[in-house]
Amino acid sequence: PPVSHARFGIGAVVRHRVFPFRGVVFDIDPVFANSDEWYDSIPEDVRPAKNQPFYHLLAENGDTSYVAYVSQQNLLPDDEEGPVDHPEVDEMFDEFRDGRYELKRELRH
């Protein structure tokens, strides 16, 4: 099956379609690139297809911040339009403007 194109770019702020968290994209895999063990731990009835982009997020919920790995089908644009509260944001991004983060110049390729 064909691989779909990434809907969100580096620095985009997104939220999960089902679970209560949001985050900023810091890396994108064109298709699933995590372990089979990780994939198999997802309940089968909600397990996403592997042939779609997967996003690495600096994520936050009401309680904590963490790194999340999420399929494109489970992400939506964030409508809060505020910055993400994660301690690593300042290490990767410069400013937050117009609802997205600008990647630090030294990290761009």
Annotate each predicted stretch with a short phrase.
Residues R47-H109:
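Intrinsically disordered, low-complexity, charged/polar segments
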Residues D27-P30, N61:
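A short beta-strand motif that forms part of the nucleic acid-binding face
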Residues F32-S41:
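Short, solvent-exposed secondary-structure boundary/capping segments
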